[in-house]
Regions:
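HIT superfamily nucleotide-processing domains
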Residues: 1-116
Length: 116
């Protein structure tokens, strides 16, 4: 099945078919706490546009990508965070499990390097 035609859990959240712990929403994106948190603070910012991953982004998505990062930063600042890790997995081998572009924001503990 084509990944673009699959209805992901994130699309169901966007469509309000399933609930989420929403932190922010506008006409371009939605942000919510990750239900499988990997840090004390772990939220996701996802575009409402159905983009599978960074691999499928086109030049016209540049402003949207910047907006996603800006929104995540705004949320982090509203939580008084001064340190966080930003992660985008692209493809199954990188750890992407939901094939709808999403940015992880993680904080609240010391992050190790390398992450993989």
């Amino acid at each position: 099945m084509n990944l673009m035609t699959q209805t992901t859990i994130f699309q169901k959240i966007i469509n309000e078919e399933i609930p989420c712990d929403k932190l922010y929403e506008d006409k371009f994106c939605i942000a919510f706490n990750d239900i499988q948190a990997q840090a004390p603070v772990h939220f996701l910012v996802i575009p409402k546009k159905p983009i599978v991953s960074l691999l499928e982004c086109i030049e016209q998505d540049a402003n949207l990508l910047g907006h996603l990062l800006f929104v995540g930063s705004k949320i982090a600042k509203s939580k008084n965070l001064t340190n966080w890790r930003t992660v985008i997995n692209t493809g199954a081998e990188s750890g992407q499990t939901v094939f709808h572009l999403h940015i992880h924001f993680l904080s609240g503990r010391k992050m190790n390097w390398p992450p993989g």
